[in-house]
A protein has these predicted regions:
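Donor nucleotide-sugar binding/catalytic pocket of nucleotide-sugar-dependent glycosyltransferases
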Residues: 1-23
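Conserved donor-binding/catalytic core segment of Leloir-type glycosyltransferases
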Residues: 28-46, 52-55, 68
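A conserved nucleotide-sugar
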Residues: 48-93, 173-177, 212
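Aromatic "clamp/platform" in nucleotide-sugar-dependent glycosyltransferases that forms part
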Residues: 97, 116
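Short hydrophobic beta-strand element within catalytic cores of glycosyltransferases
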Residues: 133-137
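Conserved acidic donor-binding segment of nucleotide-sugar-dependent glycosyltransferases
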Residues: 149-150, 154-161, 170-176
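A short, well-ordered alpha-helix in the C-terminal region of glycosyltransferases
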Residues: 163, 170, 177-191, 203
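C-terminal alpha-helical cap of glycosyltransferases
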Residues: 194-212
């Protein structure tokens, strides 16, 4: 907590948390090689077209690479046309809204975030909690809370498609780096576990009770 003029306490509490009892998965021995995921609405601010364009550059070097986009929204038709334009029908999949993404996340190698703007991204929290490293634009305001650059993922310059390409390619090529980022992702996610979040709420309510 922080105090303004030593009077008003301010607490920063995440909008989501992870279950401390959840199982975690190593990046080794995943059943589907080179599967990447992205969780978010099919809307302009998410810039999923950047990810589709990225795939057009990566597939020649990684012919088994897949990108699964989970979400819904008005840009779906546009994205389908873009996928067809790049002949990526066997590589990019618009999966729509899925209630339980646990299995999908557990079988992924990399998560992508290419938004213009973000809050506290619950999708990224879910992926790092399961050991899936994320490559994200340096978007205001949420990703930097969840991703420590070069430790559990990559945070790259906003809208820098070339840097996006090289960062993702590096992760796909280097299994040791993926494993390192995977372990650090699980570790970093524990900051947002249910106990820590609930304890902060308890502190807030106790402070309110004292000041009433």
């Amino acid at each position: 907590s922080v105090k303004i003029n030593n009077v008003i306490p301010i607490y920063v509490i995440p909008v989501g948390y992870i279950d401390t009892n959840e199982s975690h998965h190593s990046s080794h021995n995943k059943p589907l090689p080179n599967k990447m995921i992205s969780i978010g609405r099919y809307s302009p601010e998410k810039q999923l077209d950047h990810q589709i364009e990225l795939m057009s550059k990566l597939v020649p070097a990684f012919p088994n690479l897949q990108l699964h986009l989970f979400g819904f929204g008005k840009e779906e038709t546009h994205y389908r046309k873009l996928i067809a334009q790049y002949h990526l029908e066997n590589h990019v999949f618009l999966r729509g809204f899925i209630y339980d993404l646990n299995q999908e996340i557990e079988t992924a190698y990399v998560s992508l975030l290419t938004s213009k703007m973000e809050g506290f991204n619950l999708g990224v929290l879910e992926t790092i909690a399961k050991g899936v490293p994320t490559v994200s634009y340096d978007t205001k305001y949420g990703p930097s809370e969840l991703i420590v650059n070069h430790k559990n993922g990559f945070i790259i310059e906003q809208d820098n498609k070339e840097q996006l390409y090289h960062s993702v390619k590096k992760l796909l090529l280097d299994s040791n780096l993926r494993e390192q980022f995977s372990k650090e992702s699980i570790k970093h996610a524990q900051i947002f576990n249910d106990k820590n979040v609930f304890d902060t709420w308890v502190t807030v309510f106790r402070t309110l009770k004292v000041n009433l």
